[in-house]
Amino acid sequence: GIDSTVIRNPLTQQPYIPGSSLKGKLRCLLERTLDKTFDHPGGSGVYRHECTDPTCHVCRLFGSSAATRNGEEDNLPARIMVRDAHLTPESLGKLEKVEGGLPFTEWKTENGLDRITCAANPRQIERVPAGAEFAFEMVYSVEATDSLSEDLSHVIEMLALLEDDALGGGGSRGNGRISVLFDKAVFRPRDYYLGKEEETVRELGIAPSSAGKLPGEALAVFAR
């Protein structure tokens, strides 16, 4: 059998990228970039930085859940929401034609060798074929305009850094390389939800790794 499988929608069997995986990776990259101390134990023995300081770039953006400080528990709600990423219709159509026994995916056989005895330890992993496209959405809640530019710049910078890193397991073995394309930025003011104002849309079609002007382009959406 397959030792490591992808996560799928139980109704359609289509693979998807959990928003928690992408958000967690971006948080980790920002923690490393800002040289934060990993002082808070998380699940599976993983440590991360967590505090309730509203000036902390990491926790202000990604949130802090029930961090215990001085005997009190406080929450710092995340300003950013990362939704699950699903296959685009075009990629879905291509992957439906893939032959190999697994719907929409492939399996890769790897082999570990004992450095002393040279005994083989074969394993099989499931992965989405290279070139598959996923559509994802990130929602940023504007709580303070004075930190808006800084927060969005951090998100864009971490997505650019992710292109030189990897998403998911096995990154050092060729898995998880991604590229990002910003399709558009949308601003919905309070009056939009009251039916009094239209949303503002800016078409982007640009990659974070090759566009230093992107923060300005994205922030232009919020110019009233």
Regions found by a protein language model. Name each.
Residues 1-224:
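RNA-binding basic/glycine-rich loop and surface signature characteristic of RAMP-family CRISPR effectors
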